[in-house]
């Protein structure tokens, strides 16, 4: 990137031809000598691109507005002109042409694709027997089925756990309580005294 500028004299269009791979970024247009123009006069600035005969107006200059800013990328060949009685200056900077680099990359990519296609076409074609492929696929499917059947057998081999029924025996102490509550036939239906005090006991 470097500074770039030209002077366009009255009645003399300025033609610019860039080197390959470069372009101009124009950023400002300025009227040279304001005193040479009248207060009420307005002058137009034109640009032509390549071999195009039609020019495009990019702005107006006057004594009140002696300059204006632009943002134009101008390619390989262009021409600047105006209808002012004073010189006009166009400034900006020169930079690399990104579009040319892109075109080169596209060309290189297309060449690479063609080269790869040629190399692939030159390779011998592998002879593949479709029947062998089918057999290998069926073998793989058979292995999968065997795995599934073995899983089912494992599930069937696991017998369910048996739960023991609840015991009919009484809990500890319950039998003694029940036994103590029964009537003693030998004592006439009275409860047996737990104390060994003999026949004199009144309880």
From Swiss-Prot:
<keyword id="KW-0804">Transcription</keyword>
<keyword id="KW-0217">Developmental protein</keyword>
<dbReference type="InterPro" id="IPR041232">
    <property type="entry name" value="NPL"/>
</dbReference>
<feature type="compositionally biased region" description="Acidic residues">
    <location>
        <begin position="129"/>
        <end position="157"/>
    </location>
</feature>
<dbReference type="GO" id="GO:0006325">
    <property type="term" value="P:chromatin organization"/>
</dbReference>
<dbReference type="Pfam" id="PF17800">
    <property type="entry name" value="NPL"/>
</dbReference>
<feature type="compositionally biased region" description="Basic residues">
    <location>
        <begin position="180"/>
        <end position="193"/>
    </location>
</feature>
<keyword id="KW-0378">Hydrolase</keyword>
<keyword id="KW-0678">Repressor</keyword>
<feature type="region of interest" description="Disordered">
    <location>
        <begin position="121"/>
        <end position="203"/>
    </location>
</feature>
<feature type="region of interest" description="Required to repress transcription">
    <location>
        <begin position="2"/>
        <end position="5"/>
    </location>
</feature>
<comment type="function">
    <text>Probably mediates the deacetylation of lysine residues lysine residues on the N-terminal part of the core histones (H2A, H2B, H3 and H4). Histone deacetylation gives a tag for epigenetic repression and plays an important role in transcriptional regulation, cell cycle progression and developmental events.</text>
</comment>
<protein>
    <recommendedName>
        <fullName>Histone deacetylase HDT4</fullName>
    </recommendedName>
</protein>
<comment type="similarity">
    <text>Belongs to the histone deacetylase HD2 family.</text>
</comment>
<dbReference type="GO" id="GO:0005730">
    <property type="term" value="C:nucleolus"/>
</dbReference>
<dbReference type="GO" id="GO:0010162">
    <property type="term" value="P:seed dormancy process"/>
</dbReference>
<dbReference type="GO" id="GO:0016787">
    <property type="term" value="F:hydrolase activity"/>
</dbReference>
<keyword id="KW-0539">Nucleus</keyword>
<keyword id="KW-0805">Transcription regulation</keyword>
<keyword id="KW-0156">Chromatin regulator</keyword>
């Amino acid at each position: 990137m470097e500074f770039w500028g030209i002077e366009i004299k009255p009645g003399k269009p300025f033609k610019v031809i860039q080197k390959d791979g470069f372009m101009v970024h124009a950023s400002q247009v300025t009227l040279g000598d304001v005193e040479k123009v009248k207060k009420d006069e307005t002058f137009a600035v034109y640009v032509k691109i390549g071999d195009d005969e039609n020019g495009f107006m990019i702005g107006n200059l006057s004594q009140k507005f002696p300059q204006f800013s632009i943002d134009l990328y101008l390619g390989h060949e262009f021409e600047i002109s105006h209808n002012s009685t004073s010189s006009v200056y166009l400034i900006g900077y020169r930079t690399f042409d990104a579009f040319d680099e892109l075109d080169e990359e596209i060309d290189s990519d297309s060449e690479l694709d063609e080269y790869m296609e040629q190399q692939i076409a030159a390779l011998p074609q592998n002879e593949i027997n479709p029947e062998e492929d089918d057999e290998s696929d069926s073998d793989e499917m058979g292995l999968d089925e065997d795995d599934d059947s073995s899983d089912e057998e494992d599930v069937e081999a696991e017998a369910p756990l048996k739960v023991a029924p609840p015991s009919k025996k009484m809990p500890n102490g319950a039998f003694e309580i029940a036994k103590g509550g029964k009537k003693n036939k030998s004592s006439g239906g009275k409860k047996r005294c737990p104390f060994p005090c003999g026949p004199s006991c009144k309880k």
